[in-house]
Amino acid sequence: MGHDHQTGVHRSHLSGKLLGSTACLGKIRDRKAETGGDSQGCQDQRPPESVVWEKVWVEVILGKYHYGQPTNRYLQDLKDQGLPISPGTVAGGLQALAPLFEPVVDTLYCKQMSEQLFHNDETRWEVFVQIQGKVGTRWYLWVTRSPSVVFYCIDPSRSAAVPGAHFAGLQADQAIIVCDRYSAYKKLARLALNILLAFCWAHVRRDFLDAGRAFCELEEWALQWKERIGTLYPLNRLRLEQWDPAQGLTEQSASFHQYHKALQTALQCMHEEATRSVASQNDEATPGEGAARAPGSHLSKSARTKRKKVLASLLEHWSGLTVFVEYPEAPMDNNRGENSIRTPVNGRKNDYGSGSICSAQLAAMLFAILQTLVLWGINPRHWLTRYLTACAQNGASAPQDIDPFLPWSIDETRRTALSRPYPSRAPPAASTEPTPIDDSS
């Protein structure tokens, strides 16, 4: 390990790699001092022009937007290694880097709008700014996942206008969105006739389990419905094993139609059972004189109400829940969408959201790029290092041709190389003699 005579701190291998970045970070500080800029603002800033600046930014970007680690913790680590960097410098530097990623994100959006199957979800996201017409700091992080792209948007609204604006560029005559039963998606489907909603069976299953947990008297009934829903998954899986995506539904093999018919029969039995149960609710509540007590009439009023509500919701959303039958490419649940929003949610536990609108926009862009890389099996560290190096070689601007950095344009050989763990050098062999600690400072 080397020794810094100015600070009296021993540098590790990592700090040696990032040593040159302190000069570029100083340039950002000098530039802000000259312009009087605010590190949290949105002013136009040029990225640092050091040949080694990308190394520290790779660490910052991956730590914050991919691993969900607090940036201050990383900066404390650098400080302990003799590389003090202020949080304001990092905030200003990230905003300076934002324009480099805009061409990539624009291309991701165009690619996604050429596809036909999507998974959508949303969650809260705090943006600590005050804007006219909005009370509080509660914003929302929206995710749209397609076969090729994972795209994010952070917006102050949770209305149908947000997915409506996103899908305004949709090119397909018909598209399927796998989602939960949130009303914004229902309104979107009413306004956009080329969008078909496929509702998530995992949420329906959760309805029954929640009812069983809330009312002990409904536990057995809820578990029975859990088993009914559970039988659909293996039937659909067996059907998909025989499915040929190149053929229409009627042109599929005999084995496909065998499982297809079994799936339809199971769904029909489920629908009939739910219909009978809902129809019998009035008889359970007020049985006629001399009439036999209907099954379930021993339940409390609140339990009967809960049971009816769950079954009524199942029937109300039945058409969306059975989209996967006629469109085998549509999954039965929205697990892919929910998995895609998990990484930002984990990071939210540490940073609580974004401190400015610009910061929120940058977060959405980097979430989209990094999660799309993961979708394609590409190591984000490989990609980010090469992309930022190309930006540095292009005069601190995005490359004129970004096709070599688009996952779907990368040939198989190069994609295999980019999917491997990032190579690291072993630190220099330690001296057999202990290194004295410099206490002169």
Predicted regions and their residues:
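Short, conserved DNA-binding cores of transcription-related domains
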Residues: 1-27
